[in-house]
Amino acid sequence: MTNSIYSTTMISNGGRDGRVFSPDNTFVQSLATPKEMGGQGGNDTNPEQLFAAGYSACFNSALSLILSQNKISDANPEVEITIELLKDDTDNGFKLGADIKVTLENMSQQDAEKFVEQAHQFCPYSKATRGNIDVQLDVTAQ
């Protein structure tokens, strides 16, 4: 990949009941299958939570950049992303779905929707998932 700005590596072992870590051990996290999927659950995370965390942080960063470019500094963007593991009837496997809820302050609903859509077009996670997972955008202006 020729235009790389940043890269990171994560290693997993043990699948959903294992762990994930970076080679330099700055990130080490145990994994657990959720109870809803027949696992033990508990305080450990899972791939869906990790994906939701990364996507929400990335989307919020993209939105903050769009707002900054439009000289808006008081919107206090909050991005909540829910990732669902869904049955995939096409191959009897699984697929992901995403519900992106964004709250912006001090602007009209119309402006909020415009900026969120711009962020959705710009966000690297949105670009990576576009056409691959169902995404629902829900925008609230306060």
Curated annotation (Swiss-Prot):
Domain of life from the UniProt record: Bacteria
InterPro entries linked: KH_dom-like_a/b, OHR, OsmC/Ohr_fam, OsmC/Ohrsf
Annotated signal sequence range: none
GO biological processes: response to oxidative stress
Family named by the database record: Belongs to the OsmC/Ohr family.
Protein name: Organic hydroperoxide resistance protein-like 2
Source species: Staphylococcus epidermidis (strain ATCC 35984 / DSM 28319 / BCRC 17069 / CCUG 31568 / BM 3577 / RP62A)
